[in-house]
Amino acid sequence: MTDRIRLNEGNRRWWTLAAMCFALFMIMLDNTVVNVALPSIQRDLGASLSGLEWTVNVYTLTFAVLLVTGGRLGDILGRRRMFLFGVVVFALSSAAIGFAPGQGWLVAGRAIQGIGAAFMMPATLSIITVTFPPEERGKAIGTWAGEIGRASCRERV
């Protein structure tokens, strides 16, 4: 019975890692994937050049500015709570971006998406750190970090 429980805990750890890696993949992919859509955004929304620049940069700006705050709030309020909050903000803003009627809405949605990412990313690493025992932690964090490279390659396709 004890071995079976340990097996289930092991499976749960790897499913947790998969979820955290997926979240990180989405965060990193959204960092630059919008570059591919810039001609369509300009054509369909009538975006100006400065609007296109803001569309690209506002996500990174809000993400970078709030990343440490997201980590600290995760320490204070709980990593799981901050992760779920970040997922909700990220998902809702992604939907809003998809239905953006104009350039201003698109930029605002990308800013809010960056906020969601800033709350999610530190929580992903923190959750992995507490989920895995020390002897498996390096492999788990290496897998997590590999998602950054995978997302960077994927965004150009």
Language-model features: where?
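Transmembrane-helix bundle of Major Facilitator Superfamily
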Residues: 2-156
